[in-house]
């Protein structure tokens, strides 16, 4: 990667770089037009109700949109294209913000997928849900890996004053395919091969580091935390109502506050959870928060039941 300073800060890739192919969408295009976080709390809409919004609304409905995987992989390929350009700190910071937006979008997309009513076609929808969750986990692993690489680049080549260094850690780096067509319905995890590399943190003086506030805006983290707290409260209410027996109303219940522990969930932007769960995905150990872990256990259980029923019918 060449790291010569660029003077033009208006574009993502720079004037000295070759243009991205026509089949790849730029980061700004995808994030601004397809990953609009202001609309992620609303229900999926159809083309009949939003004819003036082109096809951006359809991207929020993973059940009906066949182009979702193509959009996401093109976004990831466009992010990778940044590190082939001369180093520019503004472009790197913008890319980190876009990655954070993409992580929030995927988490909200998972929530929308789970909230849809799928009783009419439970067999097919459970298979689609399992494939969709596996795709999202793979995408989040790649986003976390590339975001760490951008942070290390900024540490190594920027001259700004800060207060904190990023520690060394091993980062799994999936290798994405150069192009994905709309007709490709295979699982994303079958197209991606994982490679583990060791990222070395550079030697930096105490006066030559950067702050977390510039890389991870506090406002965005607060929004993510509010989303996680809301999901946890709704889940706890459902558990209390389903586990209540006829004798429970005579005994007063003591509700204890959950002790949150810091961590990093690969499925959602959650950084605190009362229970962190470990899973193996593509031969790699990943960590999920309690809510995402429960969803993954439930999905795996139903998938096994479906496979057993298919085996017995034969």
From Swiss-Prot:
InterPro entries: Znf_NHR/GATA. One of its GO terms (molecular function) is zinc ion binding. One of its GO terms (biological process) is regulation of DNA-templated transcription. Gene3D superfamilies: Erythroid Transcription Factor GATA-1, subunit A (3.30.50.10). This is GATA zinc finger domain-containing protein 19. The gene is gtaS.
